Amino acid sequence: MRLVVVQNGDTLSSIAKKMGVDVEEIAVQNALPSEKVVAGQTLVVPGGRSYVWMPGDTFSGVAERYGLTVETLRSSNKGIANPQPGDILELPSQQKGGVVVAGFLELTTPDQDAKNVKKFAPVSTSIGLFSQGMTSNGQIVPANDASALQAFEQTRSVPAAVFSNWIGEQFSADALRVMLQSDTEQQKYLNTLLDILDRKAYKAVIIDFEMIPGSLHTSFLIFIEQLSGYLQQRNIPLLICMMPITLNDNPNASGLASYDYSALQAYADYLIVMAYNWHWGTGRPGPIAPFMNVASSIEYALSQVPRQQLLLGLIRYAYDWLVPFQTGEVAGVIGVQDAVQIAIRENIPIQFDRRSLTPWFAYQDKKGRIHELWFEDARSLQLKLQLVEYFSLAGIAPWQYEQRFPQFVPMLQDNFQSVNWL
């Protein structure tokens, strides 16, 4: 796939003519409802392969990584003498490596859940069904997962049970504390978890406990050790969601201390680095997954954990903030495609922030309110996929498949093949 950023004056027809493809091919790959496009929009176009220049890149370094000569790389990109981070270059097609693709799917309705499983199973090693939630007293709220589980039949993908401390509106540290600090409640939780595994078709377990206080470090580790023992007896892999820690962070800080990479990796098959939400929907607007933060969180994880155990969390969503930000307000969460459609509808050019290497734009709604949206697009996604390859990580963990991001699957297939656990 080639990446093309729409310029002022471009039309879908002019882009198709320049790239030597049919308009329909571009429209299908990008799920365009019409031929309308907007400046700054990144499109995927069939044929060839693109590379997005990363901070620290040199022609010699990129050429060496991809088995090219500097002359070949330069001749393929004659119009780019001095690339800057975020610039798009062309590469010859390469042999694709295999990675784990541990996607997440937030359950909505039985019919839609089944459709999503069937749609994404062909490109996913596993799909984690979100979620087996939690009551306020720390016990499991079973998921309405029957339709989704049935849809896995005759697919190559593995259904993963996601156990979280989501209590319906937020992740609850208090609910988690009730369970982890009581031997009785913890064993009750584990018994329920194992009963779900024994009764249903799940073949993997994901622990997504978020906002864990540092005071629960030891209790959480004991819980994971016990769970790991039970799962090993059943030959079921364990994945643990981890808050991102950069090289500049204090890993012993209250909000990070319980995410002990070095200790937890001894009991997990994979750790998922949730390398996003540096700007939360409950905070001020800004880039959700800035490139340098993502890279630094990978480097920290690699200082604690073997690379073959690390999965990079990726996002498929946008935050839509009202500005100026007011404490207590919460940004809307929409899919990438929905964000792009707003830009097209409002005819607002999409900006690409060269510092965070992510897209954003602002617009005024019918009520006169100013919105600021930050999100991922095909260009910023390609940068994250290149990091997976650069650091030789085990794979990726996209959040989440219900959100619309039509370029995601073509980009994934262009870079990697998903490995099979079956």
Describe each PLM feature range:
Residues S93-K188:
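Glycan-recognition patch characteristic of GH18 chitinases/ENGases
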Residues K384-L422:
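Acidic/aromatic/glycine-rich contiguous surface patches that form carbohydrate-binding/processing clefts
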Residues I127, I207, L271, L312, ...:
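Conserved, mostly hydrophobic/aromatic
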Residues V162-L176, R316-K384, D414-L422:
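Glycan-binding loop/region signatures in secreted carbohydrate-active enzymes
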Residues S136-I140, H217-L221, Q226-A343:
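Substrate-binding surface in catalytic domains of secreted glycosidases
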Residues G128, L190-S219, Y270-R284:
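Active-site groove signature of glycoside hydrolases
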Residues M1-M19, Q41-G67:
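Primarily a LysM-type cell-wall glycan-binding module
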Residues L107-P122, D183-D198, A253-S262, E376-E389:
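Short, acidic/polar
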